[in-house]
Amino acid sequence: MSNLTRRNFFGVSAVVAGLGISACKKSDSDTGEKKETDTNSADAVGAPEDLVKAAKEEGKLIVYGSCEEEYLNAVCTNFKSLYGIDVQVQRLSTGEVAAKIEEENGHPSADVWFGGTTDPYNVSSSKGLLEQYEPKNASHLISDKFKSTNKDWYGIYKGILGILYDKEELKRLNLDVPQDYKDLIDPKYKGLIWSSNYNTAGTAKLIINTVIQKYGHDQGIQYLVDLDKNIAQYTKSGSGPSKAIGTGECTIGIGMLHDGIYQIVDQEHENVGLQIPSSGASYEVGATAIFKGAAHPNAAKLWIEYALSPACVDLAQKNGSYQFLVIDNAKQPEIATEYGLDPNNVMDYNFDDAKKHTEQYVKDVMEALGGGDSRFKTE
């Protein structure tokens, strides 16, 4: 697939990403195949008719999104197209969202959270900042592990964590491709690796939990201290390293492999290589949730129904997001498997441990590192 781009794989998609909070504009985007979930409902996603009516009466929805902007804007645009509900959206990292709603303490400035790994969602859940809701479309989830035991977040995709690298630069430097996490602490990679900020990025929290689950708490923290010696920069968002590899700024990155596919296929950066860790890949569950105290509760509930339908998630691969989908009536991204990703060939990630301890683990890591320095980016 050396010359394959999304332009000839899916066709051209045009979505304009806004700055700050922006209104989504109407689009005739293809919403993908749909399966009716309720023969008594004419709704496009199978949501209850009374919920649709109440949501339309509210007429507005504010979304904090932690997935990539192209996909985020596409799903917001389509929601407005389906229901005529005004949608405002702001792209923030998961860490930024978690910090913001904690500060707002039950009086959130947005209604729903969409995208980003569940580790920060679980921290917010443990603080009572997410609203419980049992959507009809949760029946389409392929496993109970893709929803919160508190019924306050629901999975929309599954992404594989791995190693990304600049093929051309490693060849120029006469360096081997790192095959596993432990290879990354080899001094020969000093100054060549980018990761993401443990305080702001959900991907970084996934990295912490992954190495602690692999090596144990103390050895896991020590691993991250050793890794830090080779890190040139910690980006605000988890997708930062993959973007920097594509542009040639970074040689090796730790991040989500679907972000690497986006760089190869959509941005045509053929220098990007993907490595699934030889000791076993970790993974994220990307989620969506309603904020406790949302000003537009019915529109928020309708959003959750929509997010768990093909009308929403089938837009992912048409807009540069190649994560595996976690509902049974969605169309899986074939391109991800063509690049060697397998949603089933992953470690047994302990979500319960991550839910209970992520916040403390972040504190432990930052304390071991002596606090952040200029490499830890917040913008």
Residue ranges and their predicted role:
Residues 24-33:
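Bacterial lipoprotein signal-peptidase II cleavage site
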Residues 341-379:
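Conserved C-terminal helix/tail region of periplasmic/extracytoplasmic solute-binding proteins
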Residues 1-16:
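N-terminal secretory signal peptides and thylakoid transit peptides that target proteins
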Residues 62-76, 88-104, 108-249:
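Extracytoplasmic ligand-binding site segments that recognize negatively charged/polar headgroups
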Residues 282-349:
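Mature extracytoplasmic/periplasmic domains
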Residues 143, 159, 223-228, 234-235, ...:
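Periplasmic-binding protein-like
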